[in-house]
């Protein structure tokens, strides 16, 4: 099964943050971003069933997303994953994702010229990220056509690296490493 989606978004109004400051010649100045933003995204996805009548149900998936906007931000996201049932009650799922983004035309860590628009919002800067994740779903109670109750647990390991954003505490490039643990119950009826 495969899909291709094209997304178009147009924003207008106050798109900045009144509490965020940019740096110009080392001095803090209020952030100023355009009041309009138009973006597009192309998303390609495919999923395939790997199971056979005598083997556990399993599937592999892959996706690619390209994003661009009129602020000159461009990004690429590539993701791959694998899912497999273990017995009748457990579903195991794993994935890996890579993200890469270029900076907005008015982004600067420390601007050396005063322009109309300026921001130091690191999410509009150049950065890349990698995620490795896994999830386990246990089907506790299930009556087809009536209800299903599942226990879920997931773990994601994230790493983001910003190439043109200085951590003011250390003077080096900013980075983020995180582990996200999720435990939750779902009920469908």
Label each region the model flagged.
Residues 55-59:
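Hydrophobic, structured segments
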């Amino acid at each position: 099964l495969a899909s291709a989606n094209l997304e178009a978004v147009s924003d207008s109004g106050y798109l900045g943050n009144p509490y965020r400051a940019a740096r110009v010649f080392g001095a803090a100045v209020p952030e100023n971003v355009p009041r309009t933003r138009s973006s597009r995204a192309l998303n390609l996805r495919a999923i395939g069933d790997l199971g056979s009548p005598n083997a556990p149900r399993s599937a592999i998936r892959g996706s690619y997303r390209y994003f661009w906007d009129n602020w000159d931000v461009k990004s690429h996201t590539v993701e791959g994953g694998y899912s497999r049932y273990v017995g009748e009650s457990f579903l195991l799922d794993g994935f890996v994702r890579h993200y890469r983004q270029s900076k907005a035309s008015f982004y600067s860590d420390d601007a050396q010229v005063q322009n109309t628009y300026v921001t130091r919002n690191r999410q509009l800067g150049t950065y890349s990220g990698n995620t490795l994740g896994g999830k386990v779903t246990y089907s506790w109670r299930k009556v087809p056509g009536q209800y299903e109750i599942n226990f879920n647990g997931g773990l994601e390991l994230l790493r983001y690296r910003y190439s043109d954003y200085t951590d003011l505490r250390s003077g080096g490039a900013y980075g983020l490493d995180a582990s996200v643990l999720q435990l939750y119950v779902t009920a469908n009826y």
